[in-house]
Amino acid sequence: MSEIILEVQNLKKYYQQGTLFQKRESVKAVDDVSFVLHRKETLAIVGESGCGKSTTVKSLIRLTEPTSGKVILNGEDFTSLKGKELREARKKLKIIFQDPYSSLNPRMTVRDIIAEPIDIEKTWKTRGEREELVLETMKLVGLDPTWINRYPHEFSGGQRQRIGIARAIILKPDIVICDEPVSALDVSIQAKIINLLKQLQEELNISYIFISHDLGVVKHIADRILVMYLGHVIEEGSCEDIFNHPSHPYTRTLLNAIPTIGVEMSENTLIEGDLPSPSNPPKGCVFHTRCPFAKEECKLKQPEVKDLGNGHHYACILNIENESE
């Protein structure tokens, strides 16, 4: 296994509710999340909207400060860095945003959008050097260099996302966070963007944290998968293990919901009920209110994490293979 470049330890993000004189229970958006990321690896974080996957990523890169926990980046405690040290470390962490339409400034040319990170960090000495870096990056992501003076409105969604990707990689970061980078694109364009991300990973040795609710997309890019529900990690494993041997009932339901040509979706593939409020999560197992296999014991205590070997583990008191027979 390649070297670990990111380690997240017991990360929590709670939001305080109420007023100065009347406190209420905190919203536990992220609750005790831990994982590692290896060099040149793609870790997908999946789950329904509201499961905590985006807040997890915002907390680990400190767009919002975590309540507690540690983030170790390249052997350094990223959560304790301040000022110049924090700014320096952030050069190694970049984001590709979900919406290629709203994430690009309509008043800026392609040149200035892609050059924004190197302008902020002042990594070039001459205008010629800046131009060369931008053109080189445009070629890497499959953009015609003659488009350098154009504006975002002149491009399709896929081309705009390539501009966003170019902006993210121009500083040659170690880690790129992909926040649902293809969800706003047509299916035919999604495949091209996924292939581009894989190509860039090979060429630049990038590691990805890939946030998605679409396991059909995740299957084509992820090395490992982290399944989240209501701020908790409920299953983690290699892409192969998660797809071939899903062990948590929530994971199984997500996989069953992937559309398949020629196969009708049954009612059993749907999760009953709504996602509970993170300000008032269920006692015991957080999934028991929607789980088709839930027992009385599930309501009383949090499940221990079961290790299935090869980095595959899940949090459930049940042996799901036996329960589903």
Feature map (PLM): residue ranges:
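A short, proline-enriched helix->beta-strand linker immediately N-terminal to the Walker B motif
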Residues: 170-174
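Conserved ABC transporter NBD signature motif
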Residues: 69-77
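P-loop NTP-binding/switch modules centered on Walker-like glycine-rich loops
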Residues: 181, 185, 189-266
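Conserved ABC ATPase "signature" region
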Residues: 77, 128-146, 255
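Helix-to-loop junction immediately C-terminal to a conserved catalytic motif
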Residues: 61
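Short catalytic/signature loops enriched in Gly
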Residues: 3-4, 17-21, 26, 238-325
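Conserved ABC ATPase signature
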Residues: 151-155, 159
